[in-house]
């Protein structure tokens, strides 16, 4: 089969044998691709650090039966350096990479919108001009939108009655009106759902004015909504959540998420 080229974001890697690695790539035109980088762990490897997580590359690959083979790599963007040099940025970026891999779907299924969103979000994290927690929640909300899982925030998830509505129920699909509100719904403080809507829509002026208590509550709802749809917990989110401890909120995001998930499991 013929060689092909594609722009790719390195999501993760793991060792293969004594000198090789398998890399997982989110490509612009071919979706999720897993490929072998031969000799990458050798000191004089031609790939260097260009196949580390967060690297954004122009890759040439040879199609294989189970795994493709990386034959050439050219760096496109150097934002990886700014991300891995700071723990907060690194953990935020790791959560984005894990989410991208979970939402990309089957291998080789084109996911250009998710690819573009993820690269843009990582660039924003590297720039450091906006709060990391807001960037992560905005990314998760928009990524869920691409997957068809975005929570209803401005209308009732069940009857589509325009909001705003006070209650939120993950299994129902987001905000719910007083008539559709299931048992076990949570009632976020006023302004939390508006913050989530601002993050989804890119209204950074509104989002950055939200108090930290609202931002923490919104993070819990976003994480719970995503993981309910994934039917599994993201391994990287607890690491990100530890960075919020300095704000001394009354309850940790992890506790809120666990409580919300238990409510939805109990209430269907």
UniProtKB/Swiss-Prot annotation:
<dbReference type="InterPro" id="IPR037278">
    <property type="entry name" value="ARFGAP/RecO"/>
</dbReference>
<keyword id="KW-0227">DNA damage</keyword>
<dbReference type="InterPro" id="IPR012340">
    <property type="entry name" value="NA-bd_OB-fold"/>
</dbReference>
<dbReference type="GO" id="GO:0043590">
    <property type="term" value="C:bacterial nucleoid"/>
</dbReference>
<dbReference type="GO" id="GO:0006310">
    <property type="term" value="P:DNA recombination"/>
</dbReference>
<dbReference type="Pfam" id="PF02565">
    <property type="entry name" value="RecO_C"/>
</dbReference>
<dbReference type="InterPro" id="IPR003717">
    <property type="entry name" value="RecO"/>
</dbReference>
<keyword id="KW-0234">DNA repair</keyword>
<comment type="similarity">
    <text>Belongs to the RecO family.</text>
</comment>
<comment type="function">
    <text>Involved in DNA repair and RecF pathway recombination.</text>
</comment>
<dbReference type="InterPro" id="IPR042242">
    <property type="entry name" value="RecO_C"/>
</dbReference>
<keyword id="KW-0233">DNA recombination</keyword>
<dbReference type="Pfam" id="PF11967">
    <property type="entry name" value="RecO_N"/>
</dbReference>
<dbReference type="InterPro" id="IPR022572">
    <property type="entry name" value="DNA_rep/recomb_RecO_N"/>
</dbReference>
<protein>
    <recommendedName>
        <fullName>DNA repair protein RecO</fullName>
    </recommendedName>
</protein>
<dbReference type="GO" id="GO:0006302">
    <property type="term" value="P:double-strand break repair"/>
</dbReference>
């Amino acid at each position: 089969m013929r060689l092909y080229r594609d722009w790719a974001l390195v999501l993760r890697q793991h060792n293969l044998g004594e000198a090789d690695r398998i890399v997982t790539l989110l490509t612009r035109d071919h979706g999720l691709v897993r490929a072998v980088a031969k000799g990458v762990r050798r000191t004089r490897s031609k790939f260097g650090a260009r196949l580390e997580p967060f690297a954004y590359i122009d890759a040439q690959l040879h199609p294989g039966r189970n795994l493709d083979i990386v034959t050439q790599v050219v760096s496109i963007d150097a934002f990886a350096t700014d991300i891995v040099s700071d723990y907060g940025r690194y953990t935020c970026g790791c959560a984005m990479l894990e989410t991208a891999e979970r939402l990309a779907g089957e291998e080789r299924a084109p996911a250009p919108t998710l690819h573009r969103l993820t690269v843009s979000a990582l660039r924003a994290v590297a720039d450091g001009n906006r709060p990391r927690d807001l960037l992560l929640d905005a990314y998760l909300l928009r990524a869920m939108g691409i997957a068809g899982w975005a929570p209803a925030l401005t209308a009732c998830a069940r009857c589509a009655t325009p909001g705003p509505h006070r209650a939120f129920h993950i299994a129902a699909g987001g905000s719910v009106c007083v008539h559709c509100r299931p048992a076990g719904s949570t009632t976020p403080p006023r302004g939390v759902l508006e913050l989530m809507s601002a993050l989804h829509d890119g209204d950074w002026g509104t989002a950055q004015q939200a108090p930290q208590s609202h931002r923490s509550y919104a993070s819990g709802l976003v994480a719970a909504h995503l993981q309910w749809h994934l039917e599994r917990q993201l391994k990287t989110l607890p690491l990100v959540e530890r960075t919020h401890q300095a704000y001394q909120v009354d309850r940790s995001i992890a506790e809120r998420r666990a409580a919300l998930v238990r409510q939805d499991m109990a209430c269907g």
